[in-house]
Amino acid sequence: DYWKSVELTMMHKAAVSYYPSYVEINAIHAIDGSIHAKAITAYVYDTFLSNIQDDFAKREGLLFVGGFAHPPNADAVLWFAREIFPAIRKRIPGIRFYVVGSKVTGEIQALGQEEGIVIKGFVSEEELKELYSACKLVVVPLRYGAGVKGKVVEAIYHGAPIVTTSTGAEGIPFV
C-alpha cells in the first residue's frame, strides 16, 4: 500500500501519465478517475510492406512466433498443440503448425515429434518474413499475460490474419 500511495501521489503531481494501452489507463482510472493519463502506442513502423501475398489459397499452415523464455508463450504453444491443434488436424488433414522463437525448451522441442508440428526455433528476419507470407494464419493462443503483444502487432504489420484470445488482443483496440 505504501508504494501504491507513492505512485498515486506522483501521478497527481505529473501533468500526464503515459501508458502502453487503454487497458492500463482503465485500471488507473478504476483506482482514481481524476488522474490525467494517455496511451502511447507501442506499435509504430516507419515503412509499410508492399509485397504481402493476397492469394491466401496459396498459403498453408499456422504460425506462432514468440520467445520461450517468457512463460506465457510456452504455455500458449503447449496448450494449443495439445488441446486445439489435434481438432484442427481432424478437420484439415495435412495442416502444419510452425513454431518460431528463441530459447525453445525441451518440452516445446518434443512437440516436433507430433504429426504436423514443425519446431523452427530461432530464425533469421528473412526466414520469418517468408513464414509470415507463406502461412495462412498466425495463432496467438495466450492464456495469460499483460499489455500490448508485440507478436500481434508484428503479424498485423506483415499482413497476416490472426486468431487470438482476448489476452492476445489486449491493448490493441482494432484486434
Q: Which residues fall in each region the model found?
A:
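Membrane-proximal helix-turn-helix segments that form the acceptor-binding/catalytic region
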Residues: D1-S17
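Acceptor-binding helix/loop patch of EC 2.4 sugar-transfer enzymes
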Residues: D1-S5, A57, G67, T167
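Alpha-helix capping/helix-boundary segments
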Residues: M10, V23-I25, V104-T105, G168-A169
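Conserved catalytic-core segment of nucleotide-activated headgroup transferases in glycan assembly
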Residues: H12, A30, S34, A39-A134
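Acidic donor-binding loop of glycosyltransferase active sites
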Residues: A15, S133-G147, H158-P161
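Short hydrophobic beta-strand element within catalytic cores of glycosyltransferases
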Residues: K151-E154, P161-T165
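Short acidic/histidine- and often glycine-rich active-site loop of Leloir-type glycosyltransferases
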Residues: S166-V175
